[in-house]
């Protein structure tokens, strides 16, 4: 099969543009690996390419969920893997692009997910409602310190999942993670990044553009489609901050600074995660000739 290319890295580095140019060069099709770009109607806040900007290149795993549906790594892994194999079977090159860390690792390392038990999960969800996310995070720290250290103390959904896995398997949550070996399908992996100060400025401009382009109106429109009922969609960067500002009696504009700060924090987490992967060939987003560099990396993988 045609060897895939994965273009990964922090938010705001230009991954989509590079992937698009690469796909044009090699006759490729794009497979999205941004969790929130899976949602229909979540366009401005996720910097999703418009149909016109996609230049006629097929895109997969975009606009496949309604905001009331829960985005899961397991669903994505199965669907995206099927897309990649179908693309390759028709002689095109799969180009994976995104910055959602678990999505990318699950796809390239064939992550095997532990079983789930609705009763056990319901128990911890009830516990979350009873004692709050901070206290439940502390409980996780007592049974699996490593998992607690890797999960934000505000991420109730992942805390519940970690406790569920620990109870069902009797092993630490990390034991279910894949080992980093040869990437699936012999995929070439490119990481795109910028100098920190430059990327911070890019993120500031990106955030300003989202609000200027109508992010608040997009959130208001999505409320009519059930955004508040979405377990994952309502927590997306930008959307969660706008909702909080609206709930506090604001007009949404007060969410700009919290969105920027949250995005910078997320970028730090992305960098920390991706830099652990020795398979990634890093490129400077400021360099000229990025597509040629990507082609060299892709052709060099054996």
UniProtKB/Swiss-Prot annotation:
Binding site for ATP: 9-16
Parts of the chain that traverse the membrane: none
Keywords for this protein: ATP-binding, Magnesium, Nucleotide-binding, Transferase, tRNA processing
Residues holding substrate: 11-16
Organism domain of life: Bacteria
Short name of one Pfam family: IPPT
Catalytic activity: adenosine(37) in tRNA + dimethylallyl diphosphate = N(6)-dimethylallyladenosine(37) in tRNA + diphosphate
Cofactor: Mg(2+)
Marked site: Interaction with substrate tRNA: 100, 121
Function: Catalyzes the transfer of a dimethylallyl group onto the adenine at position 37 in tRNAs that read codons beginning with uridine, leading to the formation of N6-(dimethylallyl)adenosine (i(6)A).
Listed name of the protein: tRNA dimethylallyltransferase
Top-level taxonomy: Bacteria, Bacillati, Actinomycetota, Actinomycetes, Mycobacteriales
Gene that produces this protein: miaA
